[in-house]
């Protein structure tokens, strides 16, 4: 009787010791097991519940695949970032007007309202910068997870 890989059902001469299961489950190609682990993301054997000897690795950043699965969410994030950058640009371009306003302190109602609005815009700009930074970090962490792969080794 020939040995058959339990994943691909092809002939197999390898006996790999990935868990403590019986002999028939040790007959598996290393490539088949690698593919199965990366597809299923399981860290332990379904039968014996023994944890696999798995190492998580990442592709080089230059070879990352950028996955935009939910186009609606990505589009809304891009539009938000453009809005935030535009808002930040407008706020910083107004700074020269505020500097001249502060140097000639008139307590007119218009000046007080303008300063209040400008200070509010600065606070909103800071919040937008923090939020855009959080979006970028979230996007990069998600991309990092999608560009990871698992390698399995035999138990000793």
From Swiss-Prot:
GO CC annotation, single: membrane
Topology of the protein relative to the lipid bilayer: Multi-pass membrane protein
A Pfam family assignment: RINGv
Residues binding Zn(2+) 1: 5, 8, 29, 32
ZnF (RING-CH-type) residues: 1-55
GO-annotated biological processes: symbiont-mediated perturbation of host ubiquitin-like protein modification; symbiont-mediated suppression of host antigen processing and presentation of peptide antigen via MHC class I
Reactions that this protein is recorded to catalyse: S-ubiquitinyl-[E2 ubiquitin-conjugating enzyme]-L-cysteine + [acceptor protein]-L-lysine = [E2 ubiquitin-conjugating enzyme]-L-cysteine + N(6)-ubiquitinyl-[acceptor protein]-L-lysine
Subcellular location: Host membrane; Host Golgi apparatus, Host trans-Golgi network membrane; Host early endosome membrane
Keywords carried by this UniProt record: Host endosome, Host Golgi apparatus, Host membrane, Host-virus interaction, Inhibition of host adaptive immune response by virus, Inhibition of host MHC class I molecule presentation by virus, Membrane, Metal-binding, Modulation of host ubiquitin pathway by viral E3 ligase, Modulation of host ubiquitin pathway by virus, Transferase, Transmembrane, Transmembrane helix, Ubl conjugation pathway, Viral immunoevasion, Zinc, Zinc-finger
Cytoplasmic-side segments: 1-73, 138-156
Family: Belongs to the poxviridae LAP protein family.
Record-linked PANTHER family: E3 UBIQUITIN-PROTEIN LIGASE MARCH 2/3 FAMILY MEMBER, FI20425P1
Protein name per its UniProtKB record: E3 ubiquitin-protein ligase LAP
């Amino acid at each position: 009787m020939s040995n058959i890989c339990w994943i691909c059902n092809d002939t197999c001469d390898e006996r790999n010791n990935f868990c403590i299961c019986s002999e028939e489950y040790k007959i598996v190609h290393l490539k088949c097991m690698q593919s199965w682990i990366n597809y299923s993301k399981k860290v332990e054997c379904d039968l014996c519940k023994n944890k696999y000897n798995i190492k998580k690795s990442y592709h080089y950043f230059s070879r990352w695949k950028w996955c935009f699965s939910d186009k609606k969410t990505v589009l809304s994030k891009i539009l938000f970032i453009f809005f935030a950058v535009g808002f930040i640009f407008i706020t910083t371009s107004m700074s020269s007007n505020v500097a001249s306003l502060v140097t000639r302190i008139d307590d007119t109602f218009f000046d007080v309202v303008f300063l209040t609005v400008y200070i509010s815009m600065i606070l909103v700009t800071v919040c937008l910068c923090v939020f855009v930074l959080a979006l970028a970090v979230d996007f990069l962490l998600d991309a990092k997870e999608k560009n990871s792969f698992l390698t399995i080794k035999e138990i000793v």
